[in-house]
Structure formats: C-alpha cells, structure tokens
Amino acid sequence: MLLSVLLQATAAAVGVSKLGAAIGAGLAVIGAGLGIGKIGGSAMEAIARQPEASGDIRMNMIIAAALIEGVALLAVVVCLLVFFL
C-alpha cells in the first residue's frame, strides 16, 4: 500500500521536474535575448552620440553579449540535465 503511494508520488514529481526544467530553459533563453537586445540598442545609441568611440563600444558590446550567452548556455545545459536525468 505504502509502496504504491510512493511510486505514484515519484511519477508525479518526475513530470513536475521536467516541466520546471522546460520553463527554466525557456526563461533563460528569453532573458538572454532581452539582455542582448538591450546591449545592442544601448551600443547603437552610444555610437550615434560618439562615432569616434565606436571601436571601443563595439568591443565592450561583444564581450558583454558573449558573457550573457555563456550564462544562458549554462542555464540551458543545467535545465537539460534536469530534464533528462
């Protein structure tokens, strides 16, 4: 009796964890997209104000975007590990 109840609870928890992993991966990707969009918009605005500093602004923009993508990739990998394990 107790074993069947525990098995049913475990099966339900697996479904919830997979749902949580999928939501987490989606939120990580959405957050990264919004962050990179904000960086791009701000960089274009800064380049429009000071065209002579475009090289430095572009370099900083690429570094910040790469860091955001790295964090997003790590979050997606963790969510995939939760999903499949």
UniProtKB/Swiss-Prot annotation:
NCBIfam families: ATP_synt_c. One of its GO terms (molecular function) is lipid binding. F-type ATPases have 2 components, F(1) - the catalytic core - and F(0) - the membrane proton channel. F(1) has five subunits: alpha(3), beta(3), gamma(1), delta(1), epsilon(1). F(0) has three main subunits: a(1), b(2) and c(10-14). The alpha and beta chains form an alternating ring which encloses part of the gamma chain. F(1) is attached to F(0) by a central stalk formed by the gamma and epsilon chains, while a peripheral stalk is formed by the delta and b chains. CDD domains: ATP-synt_Fo_c. Keywords: ATP synthesis, Cell inner membrane, Cell membrane, CF(0), Hydrogen ion transport, Ion transport, Lipid-binding, Membrane, Transmembrane, Transmembrane helix, Transport. InterPro entries: ATP_synth_csu_bac/chlpt (IPR005953), ATP_synth_F0_csu (IPR000454), ATP_synth_F0_csu_DDCD_BS (IPR020537), ATP_synth_F0_csu_sf (IPR038662), ATPase_proteolipid_c-like_dom (IPR002379), F/V-ATP_Csub_sf (IPR035921). Belongs to the ATPase C chain family. It holds the Pfam family ATP-synt_C. The record marks 69 as: Reversibly protonated during proton transport. This is ATP synthase subunit c.
